[in-house]
Structure formats: structure tokens, C-alpha cells
Amino acid sequence: MKSIWLASACILAMPGIAAAQSTLPSATSPAAAPPAGASTQAAPAAVAPDNGPNNDIVITATRRSESLSNVPIAVSAVSAQALQNSGANDIRALNQLAPSLLLSSTGNEANASARIRGIGTVGDNPGLESSVALFIDGVYRSRTGAGLDELGQLERVEVLRGPQGTLFGRNASAGLINIITAKPSFEIGGNADATYGNYNYIRLAGGVTGPIIADKLAARIDATYVKRDGFYRDITGTDGEDNNRNRYFVRGQLLFTPTPDVTLRLIGDYSHRSEKCCAAVYISTRETSDPTANPTTPGFNTDHAVVTNPSNRIVDILTSLGNVFPTPGDPYSRQVAVTPGRTYRNTTTDWGGSGQLDWNLGAVKLTSITAYREYKAGGAADTDYTNVDISYRADNGNSYRRFKTFTQEVRLNGTLFNDRLDYLVGGFYSKEKLQLAGNDKFGTQYGAFASCRLVATIFGPSAALRNPAAPGCLSPVGRATLLGAFGPAGPSLAAGFDRLSTINDVGDNLALYNQDSENY
């Protein structure tokens, strides 16, 4: 068991003005002049609808409801209307509304990463928690990929830039994404949305809210269904179309207000995705290098590479093994080559529930948030991205990541000394169980590819020295050259090449890793 201990408490005095922030002016009144050191963004479409008595924009980014103009942090508030106008359905679309935020995913959609001001945690290791924290309705989501699901009707999204560890803990060193969904209402209402687009894209979304007991109990339910054909076409295997969408989401809420000072909000949600992701196309098949970028290693491949050889030894090897490069150099052809019998598949389920109690005790406000969540993402992939069988993850259910998380947060917020001191003190506890299952394997042509790659590295791009069908990928000329070039060591090297070429279809049927962590 791995235990991680974290203890924190804070008492904060609120400064008079913000040191740095993004101020979004009101849609109904002229924007006030920003305080010294602040910047202004004139973006009425992004005004949050939760406004205070003076028509100020009210946010909860500091664990309390405050006017945006008084918050001493750099924060952007994006309203539900702005999200709808932009077509945003999940947090990836926030890139266009919060320029300092970058969200991306590679390999599969469970490997999402978030960066704010260029800083974040990048990698597909499920043990890595993002340095850009994600909160949905006050509940911490330990992996950014959990936010890539449909989110239903939202009230607003807050993007906090810079370290937020004082209020949000160790996993907010780069920033924070705070998502607030639409609450139940004591007035009957609803929304519906239908969208159709190319690749047979269909999105149906709707919600309904209203009272169950007048002024005491209200409910809300939101649901979304999305389906789209894949936009990559497999021309060699049996995978059909890749990178499609097939997902649905449902969330139910209850809002209970037994007295004017007590509010209890209960939320339960479930989402499911079953999609074929993520195939990739080739940008170029030419061999490139930049000898000036690394003088100690001539020919080292770099970002600003230049074409030094119209041929490519790896491409030549793959071609000799039967690989097909659909319209090389044209990534917009959207044609991919998948090994026959292999597939891309991702299945994700994410569900959980939370309860938030807000109790006004007079001079002090008590907030308690209790939550439990389960998340599982798994699938299969042709991990070499070619129709040559080099490596893969089998479609047998033995490749997945699963998280079970319980969190409890308690906060007290109040004022002292005739409102001269505004304080916030609280505690946080979490327990998480992580299980990672892997089944990565070498394919049936791995040995031939690996040995040919070594031969090409030692002797250069000359195809006359290679024979993928021969032991060690050595043609008669290549074997003679190897034996002659390395003298007494030649026979041992040749034997090693021969053994390497026999490593095929080996790997893990199931490798299981478990981790338990406890934080408070």
C-alpha cells in the first residue's frame, strides 16, 4: 500500500483589491475601471450569469461567493451562454474561450492532459495526477480525462491561472478548472437541443427542472446522447472507420431547503463511451534531420528538421514487410492502415454521487461536500499505427485503468472584528484505489522489424544488406559484411540478430498493478 499524507489549514485575510485578474464587464452596464495591476477583457458573451446585488460577476473560485473584481487571483469566468455559443460540450472546447488553457489527449481519450500558461502534467501514466486540478460541482476529479465526458447543462466554468495550492491542495500548482453545473430550480423549466452535422453527427441534449415540494424540494435531470461516424477509413484491415463517437450521459439532482439557512444538494451522474479511438495518419514519410541542432550528434532528429534524404530507412523496412502508406505526405486524406485482426477501441464508464450541505450558522457558514466516484477506461489498439504487426493491445478486456475515489471536505467561512477579517478554515480527506491492467504484446512481425532496424542503423539505408525473410534480416551480402566488419565479434553479433528476429507474438496476457492512497 502506498500512503500519502497531506495536512493543510489556512486562515486568510482578504486584500482590498485584486493584484491580477481577468475582468469581464457586465452585459447591461458599462464596465468599471479596473483596479491597478488588473487587465480587462471586453467579452460580454462570457459574462457569468450569477451576478451580485451591484450587478457584479460572482464566482466561487476562492471557496466562497465573491465578486470577480475583488478576487486576488487571475481567473476567467465563462458563462453557459458563451459555452453554448461556442458549441462546447466538454472541457476540451474551453481552449477557444480561455486562451491560456490547453487541453489535449493522445493515444486514447483517457490520457487527457491540461496545461495553463504552458505548464501542466503531460503523460499517459495513470498514476500521474494533473497539476491543473479539475473540480466539478466542488468534487475533485483526480484525472483530467474524467472531464472529457459530456457535462450537461452548465451554469459557468471558472479557469484559475497560476498556483492554487492554498485553497485547493497539492494538485493545483499550475492552475484550476472549476465547473459548476446548472442547479435544480423551484420554477418549472427545461431545455432541449438537437444537432446534426457531417459524418452523420447527431447530438441530442435536454433537461427538465421543477419543484417537488414548493419552496422545499426541487429536482433536475439532464441527459445527452452523441453519435458520429469515424473520419478515418481503414484501407487494409477489418477496422472499418476509426475515431468515431458513441456516448451518452445522464445526471439527476435534488435540492432540499428545509429552512432558509440550510441547503442540501444531492447529485448523481452516469456516463458511458464506446468508441474506436485513436488511429493516426502520417504527416510525412521522408527522413529528416538537422545536423546543426546538435553538433555532438550529427543527424539527430529535431523539431526543426530539414529533409536530408528523400528516402526513409524505417519506411523502407516497413514497406518491405508489407506496409501500406495511404497517400504519403497527405495527412488530410484520412486514410489509415491497420493490421488485419487488430482494432482501436475505447470503452469508458464514469459514475458517482455527491452531497453538498450549506448551513448558515449566523456568523459562520458551514459547507460539507461528500462524494464517491468510480471511473474505468479501457480498450484495444494497434499501437504501431501500421498494418505491419509490430505491437498491439489485444481486444480481450485486459487493458484498462480503474479508479475508485472517496472524498470528504468540510469548510467554515466567516468574519471577525466587524468584518475586518474574512477567514476560511477547512479539512479535506480522500481515499483512492487505482488499478491498472495491461496486455501490451509484440506482434507476429516484431522480430523481423527490430532486426532490420538494427541492420539499417549499423549499415545505413542500403537495402542490399537487408532481407526481412532471412534470419537476422541479413542478406548474404549483409551477413558477410557484418562478419567482416566486426572481426571475432561478428559471429556473436550475427547470432544475436538471428535470435532477435524470432521474438514474435510475446508479451503480457494480463499485467495487474494496484495502488491505494490516503490523503488528508
Task: Tell where the protein language model's regions lie, with residue ranges.
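Extracellular/periplasm-exposed beta-strand and loop segments of Gram-negative cell-envelope proteins
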Residues: T195-G197, Y232-D234, D239-N243, A279-T285, ...
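Outer-membrane beta-barrel transmembrane strands
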Residues: T144, N246-R251, L255-D261, I267-D269, ...
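Outer-membrane beta-barrel translocator/receptor signature
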Residues: A112, E129-S131, R143, G152-R161, ...
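Structural signature of outer-membrane beta-barrel domains
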Residues: M14, R64-E66, A110, T121, ...
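Acidic, small-polar-rich N-terminal luminal/periplasmic segments of exported/outer-membrane proteins
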Residues: P53-E187
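A surface-exposed, glycine/aromatic-enriched loop/edge motif typical of exported proteins
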Residues: L264, G268-V324, K433-S492
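N-terminal Sec signal peptide and the immediately downstream disordered periplasmic leader
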Residues: M1-S86, A93-Q96, P260-D261, G353
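Periplasmic-side early beta-strands and strand-to-turn transitions of outer-membrane beta-barrels
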Residues: N178, S185-E187, T195, T209-T308, ...
